[in-house]
Amino acid sequence: MTPTSITPPKRAAELRQLLNQAAHSYYVLDTPTMEDAVYDRLYRELLNLEAKDSSLLTPDSPTQRIGGAPAQGFASVQHRIPLLSLDNAFNVDELTGWYVRLAKLLGHQTNPKTPQPDLSMVGELKIDGNALALSYEHGVLIRAATRGDGANGEEITANVRTIASIPLRLQLVHPPAWLEVRGEAFIPNSTFADINTARGKRGDVAFANPRNACAGTLRQLDPKVVASRQLDFFAYTLHLPDNWQAKAHDPARPMNQWAALQWLQAIGFKVNPNTALLADLTAVENFFKLWDEDRHQLPYATDGVVVKLNDLQLQETAGFTQKAPRWAIALKYAAEEAPSKLLRLTCQVGRTGAVTPVAEFEAIPLAGTSVSRATLHNANRVSELDLHSGDTIVVRKAGEIIPEVIGVLRELRPAGAQTLKLPHICPECRSDLVREEDEAATRCVNSSCPAILRGTLRHWVSKGALDVDGLGSKLIEQLVNRGLVQSIADLYALEASLLASMDRMGSKSTANLITALQASKSKPWHKQLYGLGIHHVGEVNAKALAKKFPSAATLATAACKAPEQITSVFGVGNEIAQSLQQWFATPANQQLLAKLKQLGISLEANEDELAHDTDQNQRTVSLEGQTFVLTGTLPTLSRSEAQALIEASGGKVNNSVSKNTSYVVAGVAAGSKLNKAEKLEVTVLNQEELLKLLAS
């Protein structure tokens, strides 16, 4: 009971301080200062006080770590300061290259024949978790968000409050008006094992690795589920207002990264203890070698080390590229490799009929994941590996994500082992497989193949095509397996009563799907063309073709009778022209188009599209023949808006960078496309430069 000499507000404040300090000692310092029974008694006392008087409830109360109803979803929020990713180095040479570039940028003299100049660095472990941005106002946690695209993330404050190692109130007497902390949420290995054991007992599928489990947990709508998984957090970056200086009883403002880590620890955060102050490049290399060897002894997953310039003022001088700070780099561990016994070769059939060989082998742990399958890409790769039954193969996770077979230990091959060859018949429909002389891919050419049909349907309803919400892979599989759908057109003849009888289809979802199918009939002609899934015709080419040929009829006539009209379209070559000719000349496809027309799908540009194209053609075309690639998040333009502006001026937007790319338009958190552009010396524009180019 609250002592009579202390008012409820004072007692509540006292309890908050006692409980928060006890939690900090237990979860952050790992030095318990309060017995569990005492903590529970004080916690209940605070809970009772807050229940009697809601005005005593504050955001930093320990009772607010878990509570509230499950969320309906997560709002997108803009980061005060962009949460950028880091550039990667995969070997010492790439690390040295980064170090030399940074030294030159900072005005240090460099010479390949002499030792590199000394730059004070801080080495930190790269925790394999999920980056978080924590926002504090006047010392109280007011928002937590995921990285997202670097400029905007998802607001997950209720979930992050459940992480005991994240303080709800900072240990500062005079906190700044705002403060930003960045760090990594993660699930320790032992906790991850316990989670998967519990999931196994419930019959749930096990998480593949701690990182995936952490990401999925942070996006749970119910904070109680998040709390049950006991996430942890290491802080590693601090942002303070430029004019803020510490007052009495608070630690001085840090002037370098090493001091910033100590400052974060002093105000209540958990900081990874395995950091080091590194005097020069040799020290950086030694730090990496140490943890490359010892990382498996750690109680959490790490996929490399992060090296940061120590001096914060020099960090500011070095600045940022479009997607990453110049003053930091992540040095990644080499991809893990492991041997396993090959069990069999199987095949997967894609939408175009392409057959992808897959190696199935005894499950092995690899880079935190259990792996038992890896793609072999095509028949050429199978021949190169010369796979035999019972072979011991070497599997690697490329970029620690995608499993691939990189070799065979022939000295371990069993006596009398038989050469493994790809099947000559389709595993789905038992039709003969075909391989063209100039192609590496083997294909099923049976248009009625269930695998091709499933892929065709998925493509037709995909976001880039007709965008039919509610028609997912599971429902498509049911419809195909039951023989209810044999073509795209059959989707539009499905009755509500039939759809409602499918697994997980209620009356509401059925009604929504019927509405979505009807709405898809009026989608633009270029989306319909792309949705047909004609080999080699992607979104960009479909848009260009639809602009030149305003209907399926005019396109078919040109494809079959005047292919030179097809190749006159910018970006369309002989390969696409031949593919169009073959597609439109196929009787089954002609029947499909006729049936779609009968069902109300126009397969031609409507008046608005024609008017838009006419308006564009009347403009002065300034970017004819220029190709663009968009990457990252632009300040005010969405990607679709930027693409529309470029295309309105006669330019073309592609998805990948090549030596033929004219410009790469890069925003915040630009990815590998920017790296490739710099390597190929392609001109890189920001949004302002793009708009100037368009205006000219």
From Swiss-Prot:
This entry carries the following GO cellular component terms, namely: cytosol
Homology family: Belongs to the NAD-dependent DNA ligase family. LigA subfamily.
Q: Which NCBIfam families match?
A: dnlj, PRK07956.1
What EC class is this? ligase
Keywords (alphabetical) are: DNA damage, DNA repair, DNA replication, Ligase, Magnesium, Manganese, Metal-binding, NAD, Zinc
Q: Give the binding site residues for Zn(2+).
A: C426, C429, C444, C449
Q: Which SUPFAM superfamilies match?
A: BRCT domain, DNA ligase/mRNA capping enzyme, catalytic domain, Nucleic acid-binding proteins, RuvA domain 2-like
User: Which of this chain's residues are annotated to bind NAD(+)?
Assistant: D36, A37, V38, Y39, D40, S85, L86, E124, R147, E184, K308, K332
- E.C. designation(s): 6.5.1.2
The keyword Isomerase is annotated on this UniProt entry: no
Q: Which reaction does it catalyse?
A: NAD(+) + (deoxyribonucleotide)n-3'-hydroxyl + 5'-phospho-(deoxyribonucleotide)m = (deoxyribonucleotide)n+m + AMP + beta-nicotinamide D-nucleotide
Give the residue range of the signal peptide. none
Q: Biological process GO terms, please?
A: DNA repair; DNA replication
Q: Which residues does the Swiss-Prot or TrEMBL record annotate as the active site?
A: K126
Q: What is this protein called?
A: DNA ligase
Provide the function of this protein.
DNA ligase that catalyzes the formation of phosphodiester linkages between 5'-phosphoryl and 3'-hydroxyl groups in double-stranded DNA using NAD as a coenzyme and as the energy source for the reaction. It is essential for DNA replication and repair of damaged DNA.
